[in-house]
Amino acid sequence: MIARSYDAKPFVKMGEPYFQCRDKLRQHGVVAFSSNYALYGDMSERVMSLIESMVPACEVYSIDECFADLTGIAGDLTQLGRDVRAKVLRCTGIPVGVGIARTKTLAKLANHTAKRLLSHTGGVVDICDPFKRDWVLRNTQVKEVWGIGKRMTAYLEAMGIRTAMDLAKADPWTLRQTFSVVVEKTARELAGTPCLELEEAAPPKQAICCSRMFGKRLTELAPIKQAVATYTGRAAEKLRDQGSVCKRMRVSIRTGMFNPGEARYAEGALVELPYPTNDTLLLTRAASEAVGQIYRPGFRYSKAEVLLMDLRRPGEFSGDLFAITQPVACDRLMTVLDEINGKYGRGTMRTASVPHAPDWGMRREMMSRSYTTRIDQLWRVH
């Protein structure tokens, strides 16, 4: 499971294999769908565009979340939240939660409360008022605060910090010395002091990962190399899309972790590239060689991962005046490759090691139709 609606969260854990929770989901009437990233991405863009049309500034934080700057807006902010929620629901059919507060961290808590108490809040909570803010802080466990993970929760609870209110009242400098500046900023934000600015332009990623489960267990090296080549090509597309190059990559493969009767194996290889690059051909060749080094026969492999690291803008690697750089011909080739795939669809042109319809691809028997992204799957109205 890679995503859950709020109502489904009590019945399934993030990352839990579907076969382990299938019966429980059916028992509670929870419907599961296979991943359809094209549809989700398109619907996300529609939701974000609608929100951006109603606020002065907006930061798209993830595929299903954004922050909006309401500075300068006069009138009832709660009503504005209701209007945003109603417009998104009317135009996309997607219900959203709206949290309004003076800092990002408080807005996350308000949003969480809006969804947790949906029948009372209508999906909108404004905690700009100190009394409402304090009520939410007192009734929120510290583990539910944005950026506080399980390990951090254990340390904080050992210090007597069990609620968001406890964290807001904790000494910021002590938190900084004991943990990090991140925890200090979180506490200050909970107390109402803004520490996190709105980022209207998303900063370039520091690493790019492409990882997938195989549709079936693989035992031979050849199909595993095909899968790694496929994931490398996708990661390289993302790399070029943000205008970056990489100097290192890590390739890893592993067996299933939820079958106690099977032998387990997991290994990865770190690859130093000859020069900073975003060339799919060079990256695929390096990834294929790495897989050959870490593959061991006799195991049933279930997943592969490609991680691109040391990301920079072209020209930022200046440690050696005479260092090799990516040939101009490679830049031109990748530009043409992206233009063709952008015009005719992803995968129209690809490396020869990437199959068109692999039998190891992800199983998507329960995938919803691509109603908004494919002309042959439009919703039919009779």
Question: Where in this protein do the model-derived segments appear?
Answer:
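Residues that scaffold, gate, or flank divalent-cation-dependent active/transport sites
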Residues: M1-I63, F67, I73
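Short secondary-structure capping/junction motifs at helix and strand boundaries
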Residues: V30-F33, P56-Y61, L77-G81, L89-V98
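Short Gly/Ser/Thr- and Asp/Glu-enriched loop/turn motifs at secondary-structure junctions
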Residues: Y61-E65, A101-K104, S244-R248, F299-K303
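Catalytic palm subdomain of template-directed nucleic-acid polymerases
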Residues: A68-R85, A114, G160
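Long, highly charged, low-complexity intrinsically disordered interaction regions
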Residues: L80-K143, E305
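DNA-contacting surface of Y-family translesion DNA polymerases
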Residues: E144, M152-G298
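Acidic, metal-coordinating catalytic segment for phosphate/diphosphate chemistry
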Residues: L273-H382
